[in-house]
Amino acid sequence: MIFSFSRLNLYESCPYRFFKKYVLGNEEPITLPLALGKAVHKAIEDTINGVQHREAILNGLIEAEFHPEVTAEDVSFLASRSNAKPGMGKTEIHFILPLDDTEDAPMLQGYIDLVFNKGMAITDWKTNRVPYHVLDNHQVGLYAWAMNKLYLVPYVVGTLYFLRFKKKSSHCFMPADMEKARLWALGLANEINAKLELYGMLPEEFKRIFPAIPSSNCRHCPFAKECLRTFSAV
């Protein structure tokens, strides 16, 4: 399995939801926040790459597969708040890197929305309704670590840009910050791989190997009712 921040973050918040989605392959419905995020990201990416605004918005709607709740007005409004300009940087930079130097190291991949200043600055656009601090999780720290590996830069200024509020949360990630994020990812990746091996030997013990962690996230989880039935007898 190739890991990503979102996979690791999901596992940390609820191993059972991770199991349902990434081990059993159960698809989750495309919600409005997810579809809107995809549309806005595509519109901003196209704008930076020189596409005219109206065409960029249309491409965003196509990217979201014309989700019935996503409107061109919402996509245009949020994309415009990014202040994106043609040529301001490289967009959607994809990376796949080993998390350590061992032969069978877990692999981490990611897509960075915007890279500029020769890899020493990155931005991740957010359509969230609630802003948070860039250090509240390890997403941007991992992206900064990837920039360090790819561009050999001594530091990376990482920014979350919350489009609804035109609000930034930034931090200058030094090697120690990058290492902290890498170790977090490596620890979880190794834990998941160990559990996958155990599940391969004892599939009937899936409830103990990948337990559910009840939280406020259950309100938005498509597996919540099934989860309640599954774990009520444990």
Map each language-model feature to its residues.
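Nuclease catalytic cores
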Residues: 5-52, 92-93, 220
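Short helix-capping/linker segments at secondary-structure and domain boundaries
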Residues: 28, 47-56, 150-154, 229-233
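Flexible, glycine- and charge-enriched loops at secondary-structure boundaries
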Residues: 33, 133-136, 178
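Non-catalytic protein-protein interaction segments used by genome-maintenance enzymes to assemble
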Residues: 96-142, 207
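An active-site-proximal "capping" alpha-helix that borders the catalytic cofactor pocket
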Residues: 137-149, 158
